[in-house]
Amino acid sequence: MKLNDLRDNEGARKGRIRVGRGIGSGKGKTGGRGQKGQKSRSGVAIKGFEGGQMPLHMRLPKRGFNNPFGKDFAEVNIGMVQKFIDAKKLDGKKDITEEALREAGLVRGGKDGVRLLGKGELKAKVKFIVAGASKGAVEAVEKAGGSVEVIPAAQPEHEKKAARSEANKKAKAKAE
């Protein structure tokens, strides 16, 4: 075998077809796009379609799940609280509550309240009133002479049930 004898396998290379060049070619008029519809128009890309190749979002595995009962806490470290006290953005003499942390701009979000974490060092003697706290955070606050009061975030479950029952009553009344 010589280099000049090398050839591609039969059918490995396919000539390109010029479409839309008259009905005699067999690929005229609609050019192999069928009749009307999104795929017949120009400038359209089907989202996520990669020309028949398995798309990236389908190649990657599914992972995890959304826990309907999971708690959503805004987390704050005691080191950051100390920085805000030093910068006079938080008053170290008053109780530090969720509202105080939000007003100071230390936390955002967290529909189930604020959770205190133990990263950093706390020098000020402060009382925290939060929805949750880690063991390390509680130890660090008590070591500095302060205290942590854990109050679970108020869950207006009865309000949710009342709203649901009212909605159901309205739906039944509308159906009748």
From Swiss-Prot:
HAMAP family membership: Ribosomal_uL15
Designated name of the protein: Large ribosomal subunit protein uL15
Pfam families reported in the protein's UniProt record: Ribosomal_L27A
GO cellular component, one term: cytosolic large ribosomal subunit
Quaternary data: Part of the 50S ribosomal subunit.
Primary gene name: rplO
One GO term (biological process): translation
Presence of the UniProt keyword Ribonucleoprotein in the record: yes
Species name: Erythrobacter litoralis (strain HTCC2594)
Cited function: Binds to the 23S rRNA.
